[in-house]
Amino acid sequence: MVHMHITAWALGLILFFVAYSLYSAGRKGKGVHMGLRLMYIIIIVTGFMLYMSIVKTATGSMHMWYGLKMLTGILVIGGMEMVLVKMSKNKPTGAVWGLFIVALVAVFYLGLKLPIGWKVF
């Protein structure tokens, strides 16, 4: 399940940047954007399944940290969607990019710091 979740995130980020480049070039990126929305659903479902499997075995404050990581992941998805919608409507995206970057860094940090992630930190 972890590999499916990571693969969904990788595909989601790739589709996000492809849709962003299409919108910034003035082309229609609606099809890629819809594919990205499908990836959002897969990311949320696999993340929730991972969270539920962790709840069964986690001890101490691990529930809180994984819950925080799940909420931060939803913020990343929200930031991605807001950037693309504002780009498609030719509105400024500066603040939304800030939200997206901060949430992405936080979710990567939590993902690498917590026990299921890689042992980088």
From Swiss-Prot:
GO terms for cellular component: plasma membrane. It is found in: Cell membrane. The chain crosses the membrane at residues 6-26, 38-58, 65-85, 92-112. Its main location: membrane. The keyword Cell membrane applies. InterPro entries: UPF0344. It is a multi-pass membrane protein. Belongs to the UPF0344 family. This is UPF0344 protein BCG9842_B4136. It comes from Bacillus cereus (strain G9842).
